[in-house]
């Protein structure tokens, strides 16, 4: 089933339907728009007919100056069997040749009062968001001090319990158990909860709780950008864990590498506090303050001074 249809765009931006109503369920498969300027001049060799076509003042003014015999042919060539829609900006008058061609080929003709540039920007942003690559990950997403922390790990390791403690400490839950992720651009991952389990948290022995009902609207978020992954795993005796914080591990989600920390779990460790500190430390690193690097530089200076004294 297509993610976006012409009707979705029409409803989202309250566009006026002029003609071609039978095609309002046509699928839109790409976020790129087309301004068919060259096509108005008769050059259709590389016409991107699978895109939404946007006609502004420039295109319509040029079209009106064409000879009558060419107008109908231009519009028939513009309205193909796979063109999702033709949108006119600025409430421009609709050429009768366009109405006739759209009815003949079932291409919706829509109109907006917005300026062409603004309409282009809004349409592109909406389509990129809706058509972005998506995936789903088993885990918990929490907003901790403004950092989107994705908590992952095997079932039963304590992800939901940790999220509950974080919510009690004033942070905000985004999703539990299943996190739906979409890649809005090259380095931006947005996580959200499936509608069925939004604001819900499952705690073993307690059952399902509604976080918004228990803790208020300030304890939840609808979506959050994922900037840090925390992997919880049971403590393995003999396994070496990072103790300085110099090793930078990443996790690939869709096409984006996200910084990842592995936290060993065992009785007595307060995971909520560790995640809070990890989020604050992550923000400090992005500001250029790295405690681990400062320590190694100081250690190197001490060693160097000791060697000089000898």
Curated annotation (Swiss-Prot):
ATP binds at residues 153-160. It holds the Pfam family Hpr_kinase_N. The active site is at residues 138, 159, 177, 243. GO terms for biological process: regulation of carbohydrate metabolic process. CDD domains: HprK_C (cd01918). The Walker A ATP-binding motif also binds Pi and PPi. Catalyzes the ATP- as well as the pyrophosphate-dependent phosphorylation of a specific serine residue in HPr, a phosphocarrier protein of the phosphoenolpyruvate-dependent sugar phosphotransferase system (PTS). HprK/P also catalyzes the pyrophosphate-producing, inorganic phosphate-dependent dephosphorylation (phosphorolysis) of seryl-phosphorylated HPr (P-Ser-HPr). This is HPr kinase/phosphorylase. It comes from Bacillus licheniformis (strain ATCC 14580 / DSM 13 / JCM 2505 / CCUG 7422 / NBRC 12200 / NCIMB 9375 / NCTC 10341 / NRRL NRS-1264 / Gibson 46).
